[in-house]
A protein has these predicted regions:
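Small-residue-rich helix-loop
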Residues: 227-280
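Histidine-acidic residue clusters that define the catalytic metal-binding segment
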Residues: 280-289
């Protein structure tokens, strides 16, 4: 009888021990899954397309990002048990101090990847913007040629000159975005801004197309950085065109000189004919000369209604505007020939 009772006692003890073991394991798993990872400062991890959690977690473990080996194993088991291992989304994710394994899993299945920034600056030439894009390590570089025609072909706009076609702004994008996708986004942004400004343009302007307005905006962008002067300069240029006067704007001449420009504009440069020399040719240049910002585009389509036909730089970032040549020559003498000493 005693032996039978002992056998029953032992057979009843085994399930209890197993239950206790499972409860202890579950408790330890819960503790580990809710214990912060070993992240002491903001970091990042990249999950490649098709990569499994076991592979990613191994990479993280090699970087010392798990508080313990058990923490990593529990994470893998939990993800598989709850079907989340198959829901991971590729991309680069931010890791912040205090993040737990469960929080990591939520992050990896959210698709909310890190965004990188790249700024295209108002007044830049396309060549400057392209150089910056090519150098960005977070973009995927797929364009083998830097030829403008090939670039425009790649973004689906064959035959267009890229100058002025990409909106200057700060763009945010996930890692491995292609250079083509980035350029297409910037092109679309400019398209939308130009279309909106063209729709709301002032009446009775002499532009034949939005493209002409974009070219004018690029001249305005290069001539001044003072917001209040942009519509005034646009007004000067439009009045000169209406009167059959040449624009005589130095930034266009400089653009036409290309690499021949040595940092100073000379009398000979003004006489050297290029498609962009507005001293030797009538009308607008054939294309924009830079990436104009929205303010410059708005100014080109909402010009000042004054009478000024001339302007000269005063040396302090602003300009002196004149209605006639006599006053303009006097302003040139004052601000260019006899340059005043400007105090900051």
């Amino acid at each position: 009888m005693t032996q039978k009772k002992n056998k029953k006692r032992r057979s009843g003890l085994a399930p209890a021990l197993l239950l206790g073991l499972l409860l202890g394991l579950a408790g330890d798993a819960w503790l580990q899954l809710n214990t912060p990872l070993a992240i002491s400062h903001p970091d990042a991890v990249e999950l490649e397309s098709g990569q499994r959690l076991s592979s990613l977690s191994r990479q993280m473990d090699e970087r010392g990002l798990f508080a313990s080996a058990r923490q990593r194993l529990y994470l893998i088991a939990y993800a598989r048990l709850h079907g989340e291992a198959a829901q991971l989304k590729a991309g680069e994710y931010a890791l912040e101090p205090g993040l737990t394994p469960l929080g990591l899993l939520t992050t990896l299945t959210s698709g909310k990847t890190m965004l990188h920034e790249l700024r295209l600056v108002e007044g830049w030439r396309f060549a400057q913007a392209w150089k910056l894009i090519q150098a960005d390590p977070n973009l995927s570089h797929t364009l083998e040629s830097a030829d403008p025609a090939a670039i425009m072909q790649a973004i689906g706009r064959p035959g267009l000159n890229p100058e002025g076609r990409f909106f200057p702004d700060t763009y945010r994008f996930p890692k491995r975005t292609t250079d083509v996708a980035f350029l297409r986004n910037a092109y679309t942004a400019m398209d939308k801004v130009l279309a909106a400004e063209w729709t709301g343009r002032a009446p009775d302007l002499s532009y034949k197309s939005p493209d002409q307005a974009l070219t004018m905006a690029s001249l305005v962008e290069k001539e001044t950085g003072a917001p209040n002067e942009r519509p005034i300069i646009a007004g000067v240029f439009l009045r000169r065109l209406q009167l059959g006067m040449r624009l005589q704007t130095d930034p266009a001449v400089i653009y036409g000189l290309g690499e021949a420009y040595d940092g100073n504009i000379h009398t000979e440069d003004l006489r050297t004919d290029t498609p962009y020399n507005t001293y030797t040719r009538d009308g607008l240049p054939p294309t924009p000369i830079c990436l104009p910002g929205r303010e410059a585009i708005h100014a080109a389509l909402h010009p000042d209604g004054g009478k000024a036909l001339y302007f000269v730089a005063k040396g302090d970032g602003s300009h002196q505007f004149s209605d006639n040549l006599e006053d303009h020559n006097a302003a040139v003498m004052k601000y260019q020939i006899n340059k005043p000493h400007l105090h900051p």
